[in-house]
Amino acid sequence: MNLSLRLPRPFLLAALCCLGLSSCIVRMPNPAQPKALPNQSNSIDSAIRESTVPIYLLADSLHTSLALPYDWLIESGYTPPANLKFSPGPSRYLIMSWGDRIAYEQRRWLRPTEVFYALCMPSPAVTEVIPVSWKVEEVCYQQRIYRREIPQSHGRPLAHFLNASNRFDAQGQPRVIGPSSWGQGVLVDSPHSYYFPRICNVWTAQALESCGFSINIRKAIHANSLIKQAQKQGFSWVHRGHAKSRYGRDAAKPRDL
């Protein structure tokens, strides 16, 4: 997703004003109500009692997404877009994120006016769904990647949240509006509006929350703030990525490095 934040000063001032107006509606409506996730100190005991699955948190300079096991999502009740095609490979994951429709559809940097309207005015949003059949670290090698095992039973509230992020057609299938910004995935129409501060990282934060994590949504607007919350709850940094900005791979180092 391409989103340039180099705005003229009037646009920046307008964005700050918009923050005050919209701060009370940061969340997506109707999030799933999960059960609490066990503390990391009890994760081994939890794994003995119940099978676990890996989930991945991905981040570049500003944007976050999730990589989730496809078969587990289906078993948990997630309704995928029709005709997703997985290439031959050892595993099946969906790379998923949410955001402004224009930003996902464009193949160029957004103009300042487009950024202004995307951030400050309620605009159409999409969920990007990309099937991959290989190691997440190798497919998304440019991004910082964090991994955590969670109980399989936490998939149902997550599937509920993911389904609620999509608009469905008359046949009960997610309404596909175009190809994904990369890979062989799709963009799915979302019923929720995009604006600041309800941005991509809020969607990611609420998805993690639906898995049972304790996330402060207002502190998750910036990618690094969300990552730090995830690390405190057991996400381990498994791939450094290749981001080369002060917001990139070194901006949210694990505490033990």
Per-region residue spans from a language model:
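C-terminal motif of bacterial Sec signal peptides marking the signal peptidase cleavage site
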Residues: 20-23
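Activation targets extended, charge/polar-rich intrinsically disordered C-terminal tails
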Residues: 25-32, 164-257
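Long, compositionally biased charged/polar accessory segments in the mid-to-C-terminal portions
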Residues: 44-47
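Glycine-rich catalytic cores of cysteine/serine-nucleophile enzymes that process amide/ester linkages
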Residues: 55-148
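Second-shell loop/turn segments in exported
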Residues: 140-151, 188-195
